[in-house]
Amino acid sequence: MRVLVNNPRAQYDYYLLTGYCAGLVLKGSEVKSLALGQGSLKEAYVFIDKHEVYIKDFSISPYAFSGEFNHPFKRVKKLLLNRNEIKQITARQKQEGLSIIPLKVFFKNGKIKMEIWLAKPKKKFDKREAIKSKTIQRELRQQYGSP
């Protein structure tokens, strides 16, 4: 499994609860560009429309060698999930008010997959506590050596 793109802010902004592995419907130039690591999940979000799952604002840079047959920079892409998984996600999202967050894009058996998570947003004070605990742990490691 080779990770192509990560979402750096996901674990900082959200409590990650349940993860799913979804396939992506992509064009050829998008696949080649992602293989070079030219993608960003910073502003991307997942939504469900008519029992189908999509990702919006997942930016993939244009592939340099495709010329005029290049893909649009930010287009809505379809995610491939099992029908039962979509029902589970929809039910939990409606009941608990959770968000669907893309965490990473990776190669698995020659196919590009995306790891999505049901997540609960963190409050501002939760983020401060997380930063504080990380700095304390870092200082302890520096003082006493790594565990």
Swiss-Prot record:
- Which domain of life does the UniProt lineage start with? Bacteria
Question: Is Aminoacyl-tRNA synthetase one of the keywords UniProt gives this record?
Answer: no
Its GO biological process annotations read:
trans-translation
Q: Please give one Gene Ontology molecular function term for this protein.
A: RNA binding
Q: Which InterPro entries match?
A: SmpB, SsrA-bd_prot, SsrA-bd_prot_CS
Ordered alphabetically, the record's keywords are: Cytoplasm, RNA-binding
A Gene Ontology cellular-component term: cytosol
Q: Where is it localised?
A: Cytoplasm
Question: Mainly localized where?
Answer: cytoplasm
The annotated consequence of gene deletion is: May not be essential, 1 disruption mutant has been isolated.
Q: Identify one Pfam family in the record.
A: SmpB
Question: What does the function comment of this entry state?
Answer: Required for rescue of stalled ribosomes mediated by trans-translation. Binds to transfer-messenger RNA (tmRNA), required for stable association of tmRNA with ribosomes. tmRNA and SmpB together mimic tRNA shape, replacing the anticodon stem-loop with SmpB. tmRNA is encoded by the ssrA gene; the 2 termini fold to resemble tRNA(Ala) and it encodes a 'tag peptide', a short internal open reading frame. During trans-translation Ala-aminoacylated tmRNA acts like a tRNA, entering the A-site of stalled ribosomes, displacing the stalled mRNA.
Q: Which family does the entry's similarity section mention?
A: Belongs to the SmpB family.
**HAMAP family named in the record:** SmpB
Q: What is this protein called?
A: SsrA-binding protein
Query: What is the organism of origin for this protein?
Result: Mycoplasma pneumoniae (strain ATCC 29342 / M129 / Subtype 1)
Q: What is the lineage of its organism?
A: Bacteria, Bacillati, Mycoplasmatota, Mycoplasmoidales, Mycoplasmoidaceae
